[in-house]
Amino acid sequence: MKNHIKYLFGSCMLAFCCLAMSAGEVVSEGLHFETNESAGTASTTWAIFPLIRTGAPACASTYPSEFSKCYYERSDNYVNLGALSVPEVVNHCAVTAIGRYSFHNSGITSLVLGKNVTTIGEGAFIWNDSLSAITFPEGLTTIGDEAFRYCKSLTEVNLPASVQELGYGSFANCSKLERFTTSSGLKTIHSSAFELCEKLTTLNIGESVEAIDGGAFIACDALSTINIDPANTHFTFANGNLVNTDSKKLVFVAHNVEKCIIPEGVKEIANCAIFYNPSITSLVIPASVENYEITAIAHCDNLTEVHCRATEPTVFSELNSKMWEEVASHCTLYVPKGSLARYQAAPIWKNFAAIKEEVLSTVDDITATPRPADSNVYTIDGRLVKQNASSLSDLPPGIYIHQGQKVTQ
């Protein structure tokens, strides 16, 4: 009798939802779609049958969908879809988009998207912590904000060539993700895209990537290898420093670097570039740095010394008034000889526990601590000149950094 009542309740709720649908809304294979027949397109909105099957209300009032008359339940046991395949066509309309929060916390274990999908909306697959495999269609262009956040079973992601943009937090908190390869067409990686991907060790950046926002790799403690396509002229990665060469901006410092030497020529330090970095103990800032974005350097508990090469202290905006607040109390600031009084009087800078002068030499004070296995050769300003080098004999005379040591050729 109880089962009959449950079935009757589910049938009634399904009927209610179907009555609530507009003419452009259809249900196919347990998935709810919004169709635009004049344009010949459709997008998923949410899953309906699994809600009834698991006993959750089909039209609960706790969380609205994109459509005013339909709602879905936000709970720890939302649905249990398992293997999900989104169809290519429904009701003669090509499925081109996955709507916002369509499959939020839906118990998906594997995902195959139909070949017509071009856009994955905000939060579309967030909190599917059993999702371990994704097949992306070749025509996909956009992955929205937090689309795969908290998909904790993903270990590797390879994007198709068509993807152009990774939204804010798109793969954040994917705690088992180890390797990520950007598509050959990817242009932009937004802030927090890989935040708290604690096991991410390797990132392969393709030729087309033009912009990486500050904070894209917050708390990626294992990220030590960023391979940049030789044809990419927008970024360099050397000695743990990821630099946008177009804007002269430091984007990220790897968390396996103890002594960070920001390359000469960098003009700006991006938001969260050196952020929650437990390894860094010493930081060298070249005189070329003119601007620090908000929270550019923060929460570095083991940072004990900062060497600032600029003779004039940088003036911080009101928005950046808390710069150095997290580290000043336990840090010594070293400044060029003759500039001590200026730093002691300068707002923000004067908050350091101790400020000392030092005499700068041209080369002798330059050292580096890249990742232990680094066999690449760099110039003293951080430019990569030779990869996987066993010898420097074919390089022109000069001073280089090889395997963490200064070498004169």
Please name every model-derived segment.
Residues A42-Y78, G82-L84:
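A short, structured beta-strand/loop element
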Residues G99-S102, G121-A124, G144-A147, G167-S170, ...:
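Consensus positions within tandem repeat domains that build extended binding/scaffold surfaces
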Residues A20-S28:
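Boundary at the C-terminal end of the N-terminal hydrophobic targeting segment
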Residues F49, V79-T96, S106-T119, D129-T142, ...:
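Structural signature of tandem-repeat unit edges
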Residues G10-A20:
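Bacterial N-terminal signal peptides
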Residues M1-C12:
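Bacterial N-terminal signal peptides that target proteins for export
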